[in-house]
Amino acid sequence: MHKFILILLLILSVSVKSQNADDPFEGKTLCIIRNKKIDTLTYLKQFEINKANYIGKPLAYLLNNMTQIQPKTIWSLPNFKSRRFVYSSQFRFVSKENSLRQNNIFLLIDWQDPIPMSEAKYYKNKNHFIFTDEERSYYGTKIIKDIIVHR
């Protein structure tokens, strides 16, 4: 009887594995939210397509409309002409440890008014690129000039 149960379990586990091979999300960057897979690139591209709804508004408005996923890290990008200001920030949706891997998807926000590098560095040094509630509050008041999604 025990042998029969073991053989049955083995057969069931093989059939479960073969069903996973037909995953429609294979090869795409995914985030699992409450046991539900979402296609991160497709989801974020919708914000880029509808950027007219967000340009000229504070970042908090965009973040409040992101109901399925939120940024986990922020990377401030200096302008090569003036390293005293941040003109763009990258928001990534994976952990800090995974954010430098190839093919990560990020949301690039160009700011209407440049952010002093000293302020961006303060948060970077304090939170080590992690997008905290404190940064959400700080950057949330900054006005969006443009939105671009990259992979």
Regions found by a protein language model. Give the residues of each.
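Residues within mature, well-folded domains
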Residues: 20-151
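Bacterial Sec-dependent N-terminal signal peptides
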Residues: 1-24
